Amino acid sequence: MIMFCVQCEQTIRTPAGNGCSYAQGMCGKTAETSDLQDLLIAALQGLSAWAVKAREYGIINHDVDSFAPRAFFSTLTNVNFDSPRIVGYAREAIALREALKAQCLAVDANARVDNPMADLQLVSDDLGELQRQAAEFTPNKDKAAIGENILGLRLLCLYGLKGAAAYMEHAHVLGQYDNDIYAQYHKIMAWLGTWPADMNALLECSMEIGQMNFKVMSILDAGETGKYGHPTPTQVNVKATAGKCILISGHDLKDLYNLLEQTEGTGVNVYTHGEMLPAHGYPELRKFKHLVGNYGSGWQNQQVEFARFPGPIVMTSNCIIDPTVGAYDDRIWTRSIVGWPGVRHLDGEDFSAVIAQAQQMAGFPYSEIPHLITVGFGRQTLLGAADTLIDLVSREKLRHIFLLGGCDGARGERHYFTDFATSVPDDCLILTLACGKYRFNKLEFGDIEGLPRLVDAGQCNDAYSAIILAVTLAEKLGCGVNDLPLSLVLSWFEQKAIVILLTLLSLGVKNIVTGPTAPGFLTPDLLAVLNEKFGLRSITTVEEDMKQLLSA
């Protein structure tokens, strides 16, 4: 059987249409896994439909609330490639739905939900049979009837909500819960399960998702800073230190903290990778002296870099790609919603097996000459620099700020972001976040009167800090955010980036430049609407974009 998936930047693009629709997607996801993810999403939409009904009776099931976004997160690009685990999530969704339904019926014997997914049942235990059932829920099944524009808007909402669900899970792990957010999530997820076809309603939904995600990022920020302190500027070594080692990748700071606690005194050093790099800025994480540095570059290079790492690797969230290519599948471990067939999975927070493996391996034989980069410009630090920024602007020492961030990826056109960073004039500042920073974060940019010209604000969700800084600067200057000498040049790859974009648009931020390509699910008509309404456009050349942004 074949699949249909168009959710990431590397999706197949042909004159006949966009989307991976063969036996395997560009990410390595098989048609079986992709189709079963469609089935899981349908089950989750049914679960959310009953969660909405339950709230009408004052019933809030926290097991449902914690499970639903987490399971949805498992369908995000480069998270879970393990078909049996995807089916397991679908079964759990249905079991939770039935329990919630029973709670509703206990209050009202006539309780009903008008949603096509509300009573979904899996037809078999056989993966092949389930894959055939999943064909009923492939996202483009009614494309001929509704047209590409409606399909594109549906997918914009679905993928945006998926990105928000990922951030909800990150926040939940840190003990953060907001009933209003979960109620809104279930309402939107259930509505998407009705296969809506009204263009205006879908556009409004996309903005609602963006507004909801701003609240999600707020509680995630509260969770991270509440547990680990506010990030402050910190130098991080990106070269090897002699000794046994473990590499941890993803976004989950709690997993990193637990690993650091459990490795303390064992002689095993811990390195961050990818989106874990900003962890070094948090006081409660950097206090561990055996958190010795950051290893590697963008996630897309992991098959080469992980193969060279002389210790085990722990993946806490996206992005994982085929570990068999580099023959390190026997020493990579998955956590939480991450999965790869045949790779060992850690069900709980006990890393003893990983530590034991690290102690049996050689580790790095010698320490390399250190190369230090600076991270840790979190929200509090950024706000503390607001007056300095305003002073530099008023004295014409600082001409412009570029927010240059987002996802990294393998496409060659992404070298644009390196070229853009190195072309930024000396009297301008670069604010960066997310893994797109690996395109330029080891280069030297100097400073403006002691203020670094390259300011690393953190992970992708730390777009929240950048937004708060922009709002604060606008308030202090008595203008709107769009009137600031600030331009956003964003790279995208997956669904977290989509919801960050929706968040910015929902807040009224205009004239954002994105690349390296437009999302494959957005038609020329939809891109024209976004351009007309928000000034959103794609990158062209560094020279033309720089000229236009500096003259705006």
UniProtKB/Swiss-Prot annotation:
Cofactor note: Binds 1 [2Fe-2S] cluster.
Catalytic activity: A + NH4(+) + H2O = hydroxylamine + AH2 + H(+)
Keyword Metal-binding set for record: yes
TM region positions: none
Listed EC numbers: 1.7.99.1
Any one Gene Ontology molecular-function term assigned to this protein's record: peroxidase activity
Coiled-coil residue spans: none
InterPro entries in UniProt: HCP/CODH, Hydroxylam_reduct, Prismane-like_a/b-sand, Prismane-like_sf, Prismane_a-bundle
Gene Ontology CC entries for this record: cytoplasm
Subcellular location per the Swiss-Prot or TrEMBL entry: Cytoplasm
Main location: cytoplasm
One Pfam assignment: Prismane
Residues the record lists as Cysteine persulfide modifications: 407
Residues the record lists as binding [2Fe-2S] cluster: 5, 8, 20, 27
UniProt binding sites for hybrid [4Fe-2O-2S] cluster: 251, 275, 319, 407, 435, 460, 494, 496
CDD domains for this protein: HCP (cd01914)
Domain of life: Bacteria
Cofactor dependency: [2Fe-2S] cluster; hybrid [4Fe-2O-2S] cluster
Keyword list, A-Z: 2Fe-2S, Cytoplasm, Iron, Iron-sulfur, Metal-binding, Oxidoreductase
A biological-process GO annotation: response to hydrogen peroxide
Family in the record: Belongs to the HCP family.
Record function comment: Catalyzes the reduction of hydroxylamine to form NH(3) and H(2)O.
Protein name: Hydroxylamine reductase
Organism, as annotated: Escherichia coli O1:K1 / APEC
This protein's encoding gene: hcp
